[in-house]
C-alpha cells in the first residue's frame, strides 16, 4: 500500500556490434525474489513535483533533488529534500529565481556537503537556460551558488566532487558550440565554486553528456550520446577523464538507430556499468541497455532487456552484495502509460530479479542509491495516485 506524505572534434573508437564482448538480447523470465519492498511513498503539493536524483547520507538518510512547482515555488524551482530512513522529510530547500529552473543531479563534496546541479532561466537577463551549481550544508543551508552560460541554452548533465575539494560539471552547450549544435560542456570549479577551466567537446552534430560519476581509480566517467545523422539518430558515448578534466579514453558504439546512455555507476575495479536505451540491435521499438566496461575501456558485456514497446534505463547503482540494480521505465508491462521498471543483474549482467511498480498513469524512476544500511532507494515521478505529479519513492531491502 502506498503512503502519501503531505509534508511536504573528438577522438573515439567505433565498435562494430560483431566485436562486442557478450552483446545479448535477453529473453526475460520470472527470477526468484531478490528484493523486498520496505515502503512506497509519494511527496508533493498542489502542483507538479518531480524527483530526478538521490545521494546517500549517514544514518540511513538520503538527499533528493528534483523540480518543484509546489511549496511556494516561483514558476518552478530546484528542490532539495533530506529524508530519513523511513521516508520522513527532515528539511526542504528551494533554489532558483522567478523563472523556470530544474534540478538535475546531486552528489557529495569532499567535505561531505551536498553539490547541486540544475539549469534554468532565472540566472540571466534573457530567456536562455544557464547551468546552475550550488553547495548546501547537510542541514540545508546555502554555502554558495553559481551560474554558467552564454547567449544560448546550456543543459545540465552530471556533477562530481574532486580530490582537491573542487567540482567537475558536465552538460551541453549551445552558446559555446562552433557548429550551431550542442557540444559537451565540461567545467572545473574550485571548492568555493569559482571557475578554474572550461572546455567543449563535439563533432558536426549534437553531442550530449547525460551523467557523470567518480571511478574507483580516482578518475571520472561521463556518458551520453553522439548524434550520427541529421535525422536525430545517435550512438552510445563514454569518456573517461582525469582529475584535470583531460580525456583518458573515449568510446562511441551503436548501430543505425537511436542509442543513448543516461546513467553510470562505478565498479570496484575502476570500471563502470552504464544504462540507457537502444533502438538498434533488433529492438522492436526501444529497449533498455546495460553495459560494463573495465577501467581501460574494454567492453566486457552488453545486455539488452525489453519487450514489445518502450523500455529504458535511467539510473543504476551497485548493491551491497556486488550486483547491480537498474531503474527506469516501461510501457511494455504494468498497468499504466509508463511504470517504474527495476532490474537486478549479477556481476556478469545476468538478470536475477525484476519488478514493475506503478498504477494507471505515468510512474517513472529517475534516480537510485544504496543507503548506508545497505538498502536501496529509488526516486522518480508519479501522477497515478493524484494529479498533478508527485515525487515517487520506493525503498527496497
State where each predicted segment sits.
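Bacterial N-terminal signal peptides that target proteins for export
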Residues: 1-9
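Short, flexible coil/linker elements and helix-boundary hinge sites characteristic
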Residues: 4, 20-21
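Bacterial N-terminal signal peptides
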Residues: 10-17
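A sequence-level/structural motif corresponding to short, flexible coil/turn segments enriched
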Residues: 22-397
